[in-house]
Amino acid sequence: MKIFGLFLLIATYMALAFAGEDVCIPSGQKCGPYMNMGCCKGLVCMSYAARCVSMGGIPRMHI
């Protein structure tokens, strides 16, 4: 079952790559140095979570 999932993931990325559009990783999805695309505009890849997140939504503690 894992092999089928991996095949489906690779096929999806290949289809998106051949579509000719600018492909990016949306918020909440996995990212990292092994990915061949970056997070969408306004998002950053947090290394400890390996996910694309928005920097504007970080809650701050009020003391």
Swiss-Prot record:
Q: Which GO terms describe its cellular component?
A: extracellular region
Where in the cell? Secreted
SUPFAM superfamilies on file:
omega toxin-like
MF GO annotations: calcium channel regulator activity; toxin activity
Q: What is its main location?
A: secreted
Protein's UniProt keywords contain Secreted? yes
Query: Hey, what's the signal peptide range on this chain?
Result: 1-19
Known tissue expression = Expressed by the venom gland.
Keyword Disulfide bond carried by entry: yes
Please report which protein family the annotation says this sequence is part of.
Belongs to the venom Ptu1-like knottin family.
The text the record gives for the protein's domains is: The presence of a 'disulfide through disulfide knot' structurally defines this protein as a knottin.
Q: Please report the name of this protein according to its UniProt entry.
A: U-reduvitoxin-Pr4a
- Native organism: Platymeris rhadamanthus
